[in-house]
Amino acid sequence: MNTLVCISHVPDTTAKINFTSDGHSLDATGVQFVINPYDEFGLTKALHLKESLGGTITVLNVGGPETEPTLRKALAIGADQAVRIDAIPSDAITVAQNIKNHISANSYDLIICGQESIDYNGQQVPAMIAALLQLPFTNACVGLD
């Protein structure tokens, strides 16, 4: 089974967050970034499925070069491949369209996304990906056997 796990690069919840002097954006100076915890849960489930069914796990992130440590962490956890789509994740539909384009050009049996990202809490991207690909979708899964 070939599984795609979409991961976000988010500020650690223990980080002290400051804004730029104009108050319009995050000042990332000194902020530790991590794999979105909900996405890490999805990666863990993908690893369990791989243990029982075989296959490969690809992690995918939409972002700039600053997200490379997040992808490397996912590889260290057990993902087989990492893909970074070099784009600014400015809004949910932009992220979803970039992910949809990658999925359309590749072959995956299962696509796993966390239920939401802890930075925006939008819960939009997974549903948008499913709609763009005309695939079935379920959110906030608590089990998968």
Predicted regions and their residues:
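N-terminal glycine-rich FAD/FM-binding segment characteristic of electron-transfer flavoproteins
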Residues: 1-145
